[in-house]
Amino acid sequence: MEEILNVNQEEIEKLIQSYPFDFVIGSIHVIHHTEFYYGEFFKGKTKEQAHREFFEETLKCVKAFDCFNVLGHLDYIVRYGPYEDKTVDHQKYQDIIDEIFKTLIQKGKGIEVNTSGYRDLKTCGFPNFEQVQRYYDLEGRIITIGTDSHTSERVGENCLNVAKKYQEIGFDDVSTFTQRKRD
């Protein structure tokens, strides 16, 4: 994995530096050259094995990469897992998730709550609000909202619900960025 990370890291950083982005989300969609969307990643794995590998690889990437502002939709893997129960038992991986959060905080990076969980799974954002609370308890304060809208009708979908929940947790604001700097 390290060799792949180094090659991809160089390419990704070069790409990001070649455009005037205001904001960059780091997201894990592929592990070992396998995209979750097509289901190959899950073959021969229990739900626990797949989820553990996802969080472990996410931690490796968070430690290795610096070219993003926030980590996107931490529970992304549940969207495409072939398991009847689409939830993640975060307690089984909380040590890894805590290390992800602590690494992000130490690097001055944040997390995104993606509202697509309301749409796709009819539950909550990715990650769930218990994990957002945990991030806050660990002193994480950089937080954004994303929608994975992909169509104009879904732009902003469920953003107010998420923002209200942030306030209940204790966040003062939702972070925005200009030229890769937090506003």
Language model: regions and residue ranges:
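Extended substrate/RNA-proximal surfaces in nucleic-acid metabolism proteins
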Residues: 1-106
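Charged catalytic cores and adjacent phosphate/nucleic-acid-binding surfaces used
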Residues: 32, 84-183
